[in-house]
């Protein structure tokens, strides 16, 4: 097979979501609708967290970080995906592919860390309620947020550097809808054993380890919730924790399946579906999961809309 000796030139061909061209218009409509819902839902949470004084708490500080992250995460891949679905041009420039690879890895790993931080916030809120605002002070909150974003950036630099050093095959056909590490490894013509080892090691650190920490923390949280005497207090703590756990299992489950399976042996159709799930579906449903049964967010939205009607 021909090896491209000049890996930093030319462009890549993204093979897309489906192998059936007649389904592209359907995928376009569904993904566009999902993207618009993602924008509306996450922007709403960000605005409410900033504008409503009652939501100026550590929990909503981290939730607004998650919403900002989801907005950037989905925007790093969906516009290019929609462009490829809409017309015959399926190419992406080398620079565009590199940018997408770096940004997607950065934001994905950041979310892995941020979900652990949010679990810690829930642990302190439920298990140490009297000391919550003292422990989760603004300095610590900003520090934890910075660690999340910088940790994700470190992951991006490591994985992207190893991936982009591979000799790519001449056809440059990426069998996916975005430039992602597993798909790029499959495109390589040389030995990828080191890349797969790095991928497995880094992804274990950013997925399996955080999930284990979160599950342990929720064991303590469950014990504390059962001791709450107030039915309303127990229900509020339960709803908040369940919402976070649902997001955790959706995101980590799809990430573990998509990244920790051997890059050369995983089913490509399933791989595309999983990539679509954590790049499109998860950012869309996160705002719904966190707000459907959240009286504080509903109240803040009602107050904001009420002010708007009053001003008009």
From Swiss-Prot:
<dbReference type="GO" id="GO:0005789">
    <property type="term" value="C:endoplasmic reticulum membrane"/>
</dbReference>
<keyword id="KW-0472">Membrane</keyword>
<feature type="transmembrane region" description="Helical; Name=4">
    <location>
        <begin position="140"/>
        <end position="160"/>
    </location>
</feature>
<dbReference type="InterPro" id="IPR017452">
    <property type="entry name" value="GPCR_Rhodpsn_7TM"/>
</dbReference>
<keyword id="KW-0812">Transmembrane</keyword>
<dbReference type="GO" id="GO:0007608">
    <property type="term" value="P:sensory perception of smell"/>
</dbReference>
<feature type="transmembrane region" description="Helical; Name=3">
    <location>
        <begin position="101"/>
        <end position="120"/>
    </location>
</feature>
<protein>
    <recommendedName>
        <fullName>Olfactory receptor 2C1</fullName>
    </recommendedName>
</protein>
<keyword id="KW-0807">Transducer</keyword>
<dbReference type="InterPro" id="IPR000276">
    <property type="entry name" value="GPCR_Rhodpsn"/>
</dbReference>
<feature type="transmembrane region" description="Helical; Name=2">
    <location>
        <begin position="58"/>
        <end position="79"/>
    </location>
</feature>
<feature type="topological domain" description="Extracellular">
    <location>
        <begin position="262"/>
        <end position="272"/>
    </location>
</feature>
<dbReference type="GO" id="GO:0016020">
    <property type="term" value="C:membrane"/>
</dbReference>
<dbReference type="GO" id="GO:0005938">
    <property type="term" value="C:cell cortex"/>
</dbReference>
<feature type="topological domain" description="Extracellular">
    <location>
        <begin position="161"/>
        <end position="200"/>
    </location>
</feature>
<dbReference type="GO" id="GO:0005549">
    <property type="term" value="F:odorant binding"/>
</dbReference>
<feature type="topological domain" description="Cytoplasmic">
    <location>
        <begin position="49"/>
        <end position="57"/>
    </location>
</feature>
<feature type="topological domain" description="Cytoplasmic">
    <location>
        <begin position="293"/>
        <end position="312"/>
    </location>
</feature>
<dbReference type="GO" id="GO:0050911">
    <property type="term" value="P:detection of chemical stimulus involved in sensory perception of smell"/>
</dbReference>
<dbReference type="GO" id="GO:0005886">
    <property type="term" value="C:plasma membrane"/>
</dbReference>
<feature type="topological domain" description="Cytoplasmic">
    <location>
        <begin position="121"/>
        <end position="139"/>
    </location>
</feature>
<feature type="topological domain" description="Extracellular">
    <location>
        <begin position="1"/>
        <end position="24"/>
    </location>
</feature>
<keyword id="KW-1003">Cell membrane</keyword>
<dbReference type="GO" id="GO:0050907">
    <property type="term" value="P:detection of chemical stimulus involved in sensory perception"/>
</dbReference>
<feature type="transmembrane region" description="Helical; Name=5">
    <location>
        <begin position="201"/>
        <end position="222"/>
    </location>
</feature>
<feature type="glycosylation site" description="N-linked (GlcNAc...) asparagine">
    <location>
        <position position="6"/>
    </location>
</feature>
<dbReference type="GO" id="GO:0007186">
    <property type="term" value="P:G protein-coupled receptor signaling pathway"/>
</dbReference>
<feature type="topological domain" description="Cytoplasmic">
    <location>
        <begin position="223"/>
        <end position="236"/>
    </location>
</feature>
<feature type="transmembrane region" description="Helical; Name=6">
    <location>
        <begin position="237"/>
        <end position="261"/>
    </location>
</feature>
<feature type="topological domain" description="Extracellular">
    <location>
        <begin position="80"/>
        <end position="100"/>
    </location>
</feature>
<keyword id="KW-1133">Transmembrane helix</keyword>
<feature type="disulfide bond">
    <location>
        <begin position="97"/>
        <end position="189"/>
    </location>
</feature>
<keyword id="KW-0716">Sensory transduction</keyword>
<feature type="transmembrane region" description="Helical; Name=7">
    <location>
        <begin position="273"/>
        <end position="292"/>
    </location>
</feature>
<comment type="function">
    <text>Olfactory receptor that is activated by the binding of organosulfur odorants with thioether groups such as (methylthio)methanetiol (MTMT). Also binds odorants acetophenone and benzaldehyde. The activity of this receptor is mediated by G proteins which activate adenylyl cyclase. May be involved in the molecular processes underlying fasciculation and targeting of olfactory axons.</text>
</comment>
<keyword id="KW-0325">Glycoprotein</keyword>
<comment type="similarity">
    <text>Belongs to the G-protein coupled receptor 1 family.</text>
</comment>
<dbReference type="InterPro" id="IPR000725">
    <property type="entry name" value="Olfact_rcpt"/>
</dbReference>
<keyword id="KW-1015">Disulfide bond</keyword>
<dbReference type="Pfam" id="PF13853">
    <property type="entry name" value="7tm_4"/>
</dbReference>
<dbReference type="GO" id="GO:0004930">
    <property type="term" value="F:G protein-coupled receptor activity"/>
</dbReference>
<keyword id="KW-0552">Olfaction</keyword>
């Amino acid at each position: 097979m021909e090896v491209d000796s000049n890996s930093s030139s030319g462009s890549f061909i993204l093979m897309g979501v489906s192998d059936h061209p007649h389904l592209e218009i359907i995928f376009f409509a569904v993904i566009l609708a999902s993207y618009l819902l993602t924008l509306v839902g996450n922007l709403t949470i960000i605005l409410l967290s900033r504008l409503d004084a009652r939501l100026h708490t550590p929990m909503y500080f981290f939730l607004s970080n998650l919403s900002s992250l989801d907005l950037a995460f989905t925007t790093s891949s969906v516009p290019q995906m929609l462009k490829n679905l809409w017309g015959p041009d399926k190419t992406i420039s080398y620079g565009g592919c590199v940018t997408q690879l770096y940004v997607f890895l950065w934001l994905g790993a950041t979310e892995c860390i941020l979900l652990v931080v949010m679990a810690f916030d829930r642990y302190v809120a439920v298990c140490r309620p009297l000391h919550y605002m003292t422990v989760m002070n603004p300095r610590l909150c900003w520090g934890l947020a910075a660690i999340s974003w910088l940790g994700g950036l470190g992951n991006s630099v490591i994985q992207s550097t190893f991936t982009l050093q591979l000799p790519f095959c001449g056809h440059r056909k990426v069998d996916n809808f975005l430039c992602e590490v597993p798909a790029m490894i499959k495109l390589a013509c040389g030995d990828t054993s080191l890349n797969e080892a790095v991928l497995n090691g880094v992804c274990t650190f950013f997925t399996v380890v955080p999930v284990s920490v979160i599950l342990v923390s929720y064991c303590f949280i469950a014990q504390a919730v059962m001791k709450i005497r107030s039915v309303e207090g127990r229900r509020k703590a339960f709803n908040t924790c369940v919402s976070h756990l649902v997001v955790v299992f959706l995101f980590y489950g799809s990430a573990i399946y998509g990244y920790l399976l051997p890059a050369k042996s995983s089913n490509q159709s399933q791989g595309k579906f999983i990539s679509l799930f954590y790049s499109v579906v998860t950012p869309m449903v996160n705002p719904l999961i966190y707000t459907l049964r959240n009286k504080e967010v509903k109240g803040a939205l009602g107050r904001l809309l009420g002010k708007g009607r009053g001003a008009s």
